[in-house]
Regions:
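A short beta-strand motif that forms part of the nucleic acid-binding face
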Residues: 57-59
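Active-site-proximal alpha-helical scaffolds that flank and shape metal-associated catalytic sites
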Residues: 44-48
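Short beta-strand scaffold segments in enzyme catalytic cores
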Residues: 51-55
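Active-site-adjacent segment of 2-oxoglutarate/Fe(II) JmjC oxygenases
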Residues: 83-95
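Nucleotide/phosphate-binding catalytic cleft detector across ATP-hydrolyzing
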Residues: 1-43, 61-75, 95-191
Length: 191
């Protein structure tokens, strides 16, 4: 369709589509810094349900080297709930789990916190295992982690901080798309 009609919050809209640009997941968040991506770089965008992996080699995305794993923050949350139920025979509110994910701690008893952090640490080890399955080698490349799940890496990962960049700005992708649209408009490619 070249035009779409819809209403949102009791306001009717008519939108004409004049062009579409498609970018790999995670690319927009780093598009304004491509000049920093010398050598081999792995991008890891950890979302709620998936983890998207791509390579940028010498400032250029490698189109044949992009992967999606069903290994996002929600799966970690489910693992935490399961372990808390198994060990403590109780449920834990999602807000508590998310607070531990984001900050590494919460105002709860130490044994519950240990169960949550141990589970998150194991889960993050699984993230790095999957990255290695896609040829991640910290001695040969840099890792750039973004998305809502980047806090898991920051708080529970074991990594060389000089070789890993964590961008926990959850608006990074939206800012990147805005940057790419402005770049297109400046080049005269607005349709």
């Amino acid at each position: 369709n070249k035009a779409v009609d819809f209403s949102f919050r009791n306001v009717s809209y008519h939108v004409e589509i004049v062009g579409v640009d498609v970018f790999p997941q995670g690319f927009a968040a780093v598009a304004d810094r491509l000049s920093d991506f010398r050598g081999v770089n792995m991008i890891c965008d950890i979302g709620n349900g998936t983890m998207n992996i791509m390579f940028i080699n010498d400032k250029k995305p490698v189109s044949g080297n992009m992967f999606t794993e069903k290994y996002g923050t929600h799966q970690c949350l489910l693992a935490v709930r399961e372990n808390v139920m198994r060990i403590h025979h109780t449920t834990v509110d999602e807000a508590i789990i998310n607070r531990v994910f984001r900050f590494g701690t919460a105002d709860i008893k130490e044994d519950y916190l240990k169960t949550i952090t141990d589970t998150a640490t194991d889960y993050v080890a699984g993230i790095f295992k999957r990255l290695r399955e896609h040829e991640y080698n910290p001695e040969l490349m840099r890792l750039y982690v973004l998305g809502g799940g980047s806090c898991l890496i920051r708080n529970f990962g074991v990594y060389d901080a000089s070789r890993v960049t964590i961008n926990d700005d959850i608006c990074a992708t939206a800012k990147g798309y805005e940057y790419l649209a402005e770049l297109n408009a400046r080049k005269g490619n607005s349709r």
